[in-house]
A protein has these predicted regions:
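Short, acidic/polar
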Residues: 76-85, 150-161, 210-216
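Acidic (Asp/Glu)-rich catalytic clusters
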Residues: 112-116, 158-166, 216-221
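Active-site core of metal-dependent hydrolases
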Residues: 173-227
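Metal-associated gating/positioning segment near the N- to mid-region
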Residues: 47-48, 55-116
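Metal-cofactor-binding active-site regions of metalloenzymes
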Residues: 90-96, 100-101, 116-149, 172-179
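Hydrophobic faces of well-ordered beta-strands that scaffold small-molecule active sites
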Residues: 64-70, 95-97, 121-125, 169-173, ...
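Histidine-rich, glycine-flanked metal-binding segment
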Residues: 5-12, 17-62
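Active-site gating/metal-coordination segments in enzymes
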Residues: 139-187, 193, 227
Length: 227
């Protein structure tokens, strides 16, 4: 399947393994790009001129990857990293932040991280009003954000989710000895209430009992995420 096309491409990648989950393609082929879009795809593009040609044999070419569990609220939590600094090394173009921000600070995440980024940045909103706030760069779990039930206001979380429909894709809760102390299943129950009202999935981080992991799994719904 040689390509008869001769229009000059901006970039050609030769001999890479092209994987496209949407079309089911998984083959070693040449691929060319023009004006930022795929212009040709064939077993060989030897007759097509290109401004840049790179042999990528042994490498994978794919659409941008999605990382479902990241913390990219740089400056908003000690866990936060700059998404732009990772994308060229990882091939990731969609970063899903796993609960760095809650109802009290998601607006900052949206305005200063998601909106200005050239990448696609989405978020799970933390059921805790303050998000993941109890970390420093040297000491984890200074403050378990889900231990104080006063921070777990379901109505505040629902209202904030509805304020940012362009980026919120779910609800995040962290439970266990270090994340929620003696609060038991209560943080998870509140988070599930929000998930059911908003029709969004729930992502649950579990550290050490209590609560028991089987109890947590049995409470989660199909389509929810364990992390």
């Amino acid at each position: 399947r040689d390509s008869p096309m001769t229009e000059q491409a901006d970039l050609m990648l030769k001999g890479g393994r092209i994987i496209d989950p949407e079309s089911g393609l998984d083959e070693i082929q040449d691929i060319a790009f023009k004006d930022g879009k795929v212009s040709a795809l064939a077993d060989s593009l030897a007759t097509m001129p290109a401004k840049q040609i790179h042999d990528v044999s042994g490498k994978i070419i794919s659409p941008g990857l999605i990382d479902l569990h990241t913390h990219v609220y740089w400056g908003g939590t000690a866990l936060g990293v700059e998404a732009e600094s990772l994308t060229s090394r990882s091939g990731t173009t969609t970063f899903v932040d796993a609960g760095s921000a809650g109802a009290g600070n998601y607006a900052g995440f949206q305005r200063f991280i998601a909106d200005p980024s050239k990448l696609r940045i989405l978020g799970f909103m933390n059921i805790s009003f303050a998000g993941i706030c109890g970390f420093s760069k040297t000491t984890p779990n200074i403050f378990p954000e889900c231990e104080d039930i006063r921070l777990l206001d379901a109505r505040e979380c629902v209202d904030a989710i509805r304020e940012f429909p362009q980026s919120v894709v779910g609800i995040k809760v962290r439970i266990g000895r270090y994340a929620s102390g003696n609060a038991g299943m209560t943080p998870l129950q509140i988070a599930r209430e929000v998930a059911e009202e908003t029709g969004l999935p729930l992502m649950t981080h579990v550290d050490f009992p209590p609560p028991d992991r089987d109890e947590v799994l049995n409470f989660m719904r199909p389509g929810d995420i364990w992390t």
